[in-house]
């Protein structure tokens, strides 16, 4: 929703999958849920699922919610394996012609796991696109080549993004991206849908910082198509 509004609003079949949508045992309260004012994480996950359904309904979509636990809910237990993700996903979505996954441009363990799984699929011949994941990717704003701003010699967003892509050789050229600029009408509709996440939005928005509510942020969406022919272990410089 935050990252793929243009895609969600496009025609054609599209399966939206929330990979880590499992509900933890009652009586637990994690850090993020505490920040967002929850009193019980199991209750909060159900509230988030309801909000997600409402938001997706605005573009005529629904979601498949897999039972895997979010990183905060499974700690201190282990992360699921790629086999665990594959089994949960194929049981609910048995076939696909293309996969869209987060680029992992921030310290989000779950996004990195899904990206890893998507990279494996790319190596097996399934077309894969990675998307810049808000709000993590805009800690330093958008790169000038995304939003058309003047280059700033003291703000190199490319350098920030590259630190999270060192193990993604399939994404060879950072600026070889598809950038979507939503017009005012679509940007306003996206913001309205994001606000549907009532329990999450104000914290994700950074309060008065207004990170996500800033049209200069939420109107842009960035994607990369992975090159599955890239040698997986080579060392190279991204330009």
Predicted regions and their residues:
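The feature marks non-catalytic terminal segments
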Residues: 50-66, 75-80, 94, 124-239
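Active-site beta-strand->loop->alpha-helix modules in alpha/beta enzyme cores, enriched
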Residues: 1-124, 188
